[in-house]
UniProtKB/Swiss-Prot annotation:
A motif (Antp-type hexapeptide) lies at residues 176-181. GO terms for cellular component: nucleus. It comes from the Eukaryota. Its main location: nucleus. Residues 60-175 are annotated as: Disordered. Residues 119-134, 154-166 have a biased composition (Low complexity). This is Homeobox protein Hox-A5. It comes from Lemur catta (Ring-tailed lemur). The gene is HOXA5.
Length: 270
């Protein structure tokens, strides 16, 4: 498929040096800078462009007669013939171009001179505008570089001042007061640095289980204390203290009850 397209384009688009310059007026009015088609294409497309090279698989007898065209260009190298499709619309496009006429045989006409002068004036104006644009761009670049240098100077001065200043000392640890500490976090350090033990808040489930255990046995063994501590997520010290307090309360209640009963019995004694 690719070879089909390449072979079909070979005859239609000749090489860069052989490519004809499209001219709508008299061929004698063409400027010197546009006589060489290779230089025209290189100037139009920039950076050494020599046109489209699709000469792969070209035969000696192309659509345009490449051999005859090369000989005609060698004979009249100083002229630039016009393309037959514009100069002779009646002839076929597949026929070879006619032989070019010498420059001396063609008399310059005032119209062609004016056309040539218009082209030169256009070329001069375009060159002047290009020069003005380049100078404007260069001036803008100069302003940009100057502003960049001015911006770099304060930045460098700021860096130097930052390096000269001593680095600030790391902030000290904030002071923690006793009322800022959280309670009931760990049961291992209940006393704390100040020596005051925190009050333990028992849940309803823990209180109910401890009351049941106290109802069956007022004194716990070490093994039973460890089991209750694991079951209620408490420490052995907390279990021990709770049972001590509960026994003291029980004794107080019993003492008051016995004293009240004794007082009541002595009052009713005959």
């Amino acid at each position: 498929m690719s070879s089909y397209f390449v072979n079909s384009f070979c005859g239609r688009y000749p090489n860069g040096p052989d490519y004809q310059l499209h001219n709508y007026g008299d061929h004698s009015s063409v400027s010197e800078q546009f006589r060489d088609s290779a230089s025209m294409h290189s100037g139009r497309y920039g950076y050494g462009y020599n046109g489209m090279d699709l000469s792969v698989g070209r035969s000696g007898s192309g659509h345009f007669g490449s051999g005859e065209r090369a000989r005609s260009y060698a004979a009249g190298a100083t002229t630039a013939p016009a393309e037959p499709r514009y100069s002779q619309p009646a002839t076929s496009t597949h026929s070879p171009p006619p032989d070019p006429l010498p420059c001396s045989a063609v008399a310059p006409s005032p119209g062609s001179d004016s056309h040539h002068g218009g082209k030169n004036s256009l070329g001069n104006s375009s060159g002047a505008s290009a020069n003005a644009g380049s100078t404007h761009i260069s001036s803008r670049e100069g302003v940009g570089t100057a502003s960049g240098a001015e911006e770099d100077a304060p930045a460098s001065s700021e860096q130097a001042s930052a390096q000269s200043e001593p680095s600030p000392a790391p902030p000290a640890q904030p002071q923690i007061y006793p009322w800022m500490r959280k309670l009931h976090i760990s049961h291992d350090n209940i006393g704390g640095p100040e020596g005051k033990r925190a009050r333990t808040a028992y849940t309803r489930y823990q209180t109910l289980e401890l009351e049941k255990e106290f109802h069956f046995n007022r004194y716990l063994t070490r093994r039973r204390r460890i089991e209750i501590a694991h079951a209620l997520c408490l420490s052995e010290r907390q279990i021990k203290i709770w049972f001590q307090n509960r026994r003291m309360k029980w004794k107080k209640d019993n003492k008051l009850k016995s004293m009240s009963m004794a007082a009541a019995g002595g009052a009713f004694r005959p």
